[in-house]
A protein has these predicted regions:
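Extracytoplasmic/periplasmic substrate-recognition and gating elements
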Residues: 6-7, 32, 86, 109-110, ...
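Glycine-centered hinge/linker elements that transmit conformational signals in sensory
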Residues: 126-128, 169-200
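Extracytoplasmic/periplasmic solute-binding protein
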Residues: 81-93, 98, 123-172, 188, ...
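Hinge/lid segment of periplasmic solute-binding proteins
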Residues: 44-99, 123, 150, 179, ...
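Short, solvent-exposed loop/beta-turn-alpha elements that line the ligand-binding surface or hinge
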Residues: 60-75, 158-182, 232-233, 246-256
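A local structural motif
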Residues: 6-17, 110-114, 189-202, 233-238
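Short helix-initiation/N-cap motifs at beta->coil->alpha
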Residues: 16-25, 44, 117-123, 199-213
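Conserved N-terminal structural module of periplasmic/extracytoplasmic solute-binding proteins
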Residues: 1-53, 61-70, 114, 235, ...
Length: 287
């Protein structure tokens, strides 16, 4: 807004509140090659679709041009680097990490002294919590990415990016990869044994946040993007944290806290003129 006011420019912002509706609309824009000047885009299938139609500005080159490449966090650069050509096509929204939060009072009530370090311990703790009449885990099941996290935990800890890259390339599958098969069984257990909240499949992430931070459920997978919601409970000593557990019986990498760039921004190559480049520099200076 400030940039446009200074330059005497008009601007239009399109808001789509529902995540799945947003993805659908973004795909429509990609299919018709009518992407807006700037658009939110997760790193993955949708960004690849944009790249396939040559619709993305090379953000890495632009950061090198204006001197901000050396100021970019290395983990964020790695996260947004394209696996095919090594370029960076998305501008990071921020630096985020993800982890499990848990309510200490419910753990104590269930006789759980330490946070789980393996998925086997995680499920055992869920049963102890359920035995106390409490909801073990809150999840926003209507937002697919929430459940996908549970499918990704085990292969990520065991193979790093190897499985997901192989899955996308068609060279690996959930039926062939042992860590991925483990993840399928884990998610099945959590859903069928009643460890998720009732009706979890119709609960979106925002509602899941409201449930957990409103006092329902023992465990919630979230991250630094929602840390402000946890402030009161944390200040009162009610919350604990633990990273993604190990997959027992397999060789796990030491990294257990996912780090990412959030919902990154793409710049439409077709409309990236001198004014847009000037705005890009303004973003870098003021973001």
């Amino acid at each position: 807004k400030n940039f446009c006011d200074e330059k005497g420019l008009d601007y239009e912002i399109e808001l789509v509140n529902d995540m799945q509706d947003y993805f659908t609309k973004l795909q429509m824009y990609i299919n018709s090659d009518t992407l807006p000047d700037i658009f939110g885009c997760p790193n993955g299938t949708l960004s690849k679709a944009c790249k396939d139609i040559d619709a993305l500005v090379n953000v890495g080159d632009e950061l090198e041009r204006n001197g901000y490449d050396e100021k970019l966090n290395g983990a964020i650069r790695d996260f947004l680097t394209d696996a095919d050509d090594g370029n960076m096509y998305l501008f990071p929204q921020g630096l985020y990490c993800e982890y499990f939060m848990y309510r200490k009072d419910i753990f104590e009530k269930a006789g759980i002294k330490d946070a789980p370090t393996t998925w086997e311990e995680f499920e055992e703790d869920c049963q102890k919590i359920a035995d106390q009449g409490e909801i073990p885990v809150i999840v926003g099941g209507s937002d697919a990415w929430q459940l996908m996290r549970y499918l990704s935990f085990s292969p990520w800890r065991v193979t790093g990016p190897e499985f997901i890259e192989g899955y996308q390339a068609g060279t690996d599958s959930f039926s062939d990869n042992e860590s991925a098969k483990y993840a399928v069984n884990l998610l099945s257990d959590l859903g069928t044994k009643g460890y998720f909240e009732p009706g979890f499949a119709s609960v979106d992430f925002t509602s899941a946040c409201n449930l957990f931070f409103g006092g329902s459920g023992a465990i919630f997978y979230t991250g630094s993007g929602q840390i402000s919601l946890a402030e009161e409970m944390y200040d009162n000593g009610e919350l604990g944290f633990f990273p993604v557990p190990d997959t027992e019986g397999m060789d796990n990498m030491s990294t257990n806290v996912p780090v990412h760039a959030g919902f990154a921004e793409g710049f439409n190559k077709a409309t990236y003129d001198d004014t847009m480049q000037e705005f890009f520099d303004y973003m870098c200076e003021n973001f």
